[in-house]
Amino acid sequence: MAASLVNPAGLARSGGKRLTLGAQGAFSNLHINDRRTDLSEPAGGVFGLTAPAPLGGALAGRIHVGLGMYVLPGSIARIVARYPDEPFYPYYQGRTERLVIVPGVGVRVTSRFEVGVAANFMAGLGGALQASEGSTRALDARVDEKVPAVARVIAGAAWRPLDALRVGLVFRQRFEVPFATRAETEVAGEPIDLDLRASGQFSPSQLVAGVAWLTSAATVSADVTFARWSAYPGPFVEVKSELPLVGPLAGELPTVPWKDTFGGKLGVEAPLGDAVILRGGYAFETSPVPAEQPGVTNLLDGPRHTIAAGVGLVHTRVKGKRVRLDLHLQTQIVQGRTLRKTVFAPGEDGDGFDGLRDEVTDNANDPATQGAQISNPGFPRIDSGGQVFAGGLTMEVEL
Amino acid sequence: MLLALTATTAAADPLDEFGFGSGAAGVAGARTATARGAEAAHHNPAGVALGVHPELLLGWGYGAMQLEINGRDARVLDVRGTSIGLAVPFTLDDDWTLGTGIALYLPDQFLARLQLIPSNEPHFVLLDNDPHRAVVEPVAAVAYRGKVALGAGASVLANARSNKILFDVGIVGGEKVGAAELDVELPVRLAPLVGLWAQPHPRVRAGLTYRGKLALDLALDILANVQIAGVVTGDVLVSLRASNYFTPARVSGGVAIDVLPDLTLAADVTVNRWSTYPAAADLAVLIALDIAPPLVSSTVPPSAFTDTVDGELGIEYRNRGRRTDVTVRAGGAWRPSPVPPQVGLTSWADGDRLVLTAGGGLTLADWAPILTRPIDFDLALQWHHVAHQLTQKQIDTFPGEAFSSGGNIFHAGLSATVRF
């Protein structure tokens, strides 16, 4: 089931009809200064199904289809865009609160080469509201808000040049859930227009290469990942407005230099007798968030170390069906960082990301206005770091 | 300033309108007693435990909405979308079988659309928007000896709700600046689905289903805080409440009789609780801030929809070949309108509907070794005639013009059912 998302080519090796059910969750021990911060949707359900295409002859057993789903308990998706100065962890907060639906197909081209493709599905929200006084002086309102489908590709290949060696390559297309709404109202001749745009649940385009060494004693695998975070539009909301007595005004957004990330993973899987499999692994990934943020933003993150362990109980029989149980536990350690702010000198101009401005113009007759008046919650410094603990249990049933 | 809008448009499930899979569409949806496997996920959840092998149904349909208001094209969006069904049976022992499945319908253009049209503007309140939404129906069932089955599940939809949309306008360093934050959620809504199926005689099958009511509610509150000292202070709240895709609670009963071993007659009767359709538009404007325009508000009378009873009749003939089976289908349905006479402020167009259908299918039943399991290919054609009617207003009480409405819907669909 996991192959739909990890590498769809792996579906071609799934063999037989299998149903997977499970649950997973996470707990945050991430800190903003001395305060712990939570994840908004920390738990969800897992569902998966794989089956061979009903083809015989030369195509027998070569094509498998699969479906992987992650289901939140009460929501399909959530789009959160914050004030530019709000301290939060953009890697964790606003990227995991959505239903995931990934159908895929894997094809065994030769006995040593497989390819696969899957689609990552979701929905957005966009449209417009127009209202003005009608002929009866009541409001005539027109609303046209659409929930469009969003689909992005995951493609993969796997090659086994030697009996003991398998290599793989995966591309995951950038994914995000868009939100846009335009409210155009007119009352008593006064326009009240608000145009909002944001995107949530962002995942960058990723390229992953992996290698696995298979022996009777253990399987050792290693992955390297490149993620194009530099294309991230940011976790903020873009606003254009026209309000009574205020006139046209657009929200000012800082230009954040997001960093592309590189990561590496190393995993070991070893059987313990016929019925138990032990697993362990370590991963490291650089942070997409700039380490220096002298201006308005307080985007918290750091290089990430992941330590994982798991156990699988295989070939248990329930009502004559083969069942496999898999349990995993994981700790992600986010390295600590301190962000220090810079205040622009009087008359100095620059992007909001590069420095803070004195918010109150100095008045020689008012001592309270003298010096820098800053309300940014990260001023003069803000500390971050911590851990995220995750775990899950799945049951795979042979149909 | 407070601007509050509340409005509703009504709809039934798009799969109720055109059927789930072309096999069901060819018999006008009279499938409560005969659905098994993937198509049962929508037509009777009990049937997902009646299949032998896992099934995947893939279909696509297109409907030309040739509807008119005042003799002109009513500009109702054509219907097109993909149906996906899945049923996975598990045989526990010789007596008991479990099954799980899901019915999905995905419109091509979007998953859903929230549409609000001024209620005094003539438009098709049911057909304007109702066929244009995604349907998600996960179900599970248990069957005993293939004679009795019970299924349950949910029809899933989402609301669209803003927990917070704030736009702050103020002065920083002597300049006007704005900053915003936003928290929008698509929370899940569920309506229960229950199905019962029985085969009291080798040639007779009966089914009963219940589905709760469902709707998609939009709640967007956009608050702009303005703090420009000496110029203007206060706030502006644009608050939108709209409810779309109201799908009434319904109970369907169906009977199917194999008149001959290869000829089946099926009939369904469905009671739709349209009388619970919520009140329509309620608009108000509360003015504050420094500009002080007057309060604007309106009250619209209750929708007063009436419960309806639909009837569907279908016939299916199967010719079993050596390797390939051929099936021919026909059906008809009568769907009365729940919309009351529009003599007041609202101008909702609708009409009683006559539905005639025809279809056919090929089953590649024994094509080993090319195919290891049978595959079905089905085609269906439907004609929905919406009765023409002339609506005249009570001119003394409500201003407004008379309007006429009616028309036709032509729908065609193809589907394939693959077993694994």
Where are these regions (language model features)?
Chain A
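Glycine-rich loop/turn
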Residues: 1
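N-terminal periplasmic accessory domains that precede
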Residues: 4-10
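Transmembrane beta-strand segments of Gram-negative outer membrane beta-barrel proteins
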Residues: 12-28
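Outer-membrane beta-barrel porins/channels
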Residues: 16, 44, 50-399
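Surface-exposed strand-loop-strand hairpins of Gram-negative outer-membrane beta-barrel proteins
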Residues: 27-41
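N-terminal beta-strand/beta-hairpin edge segment
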Residues: 34-35, 46-48
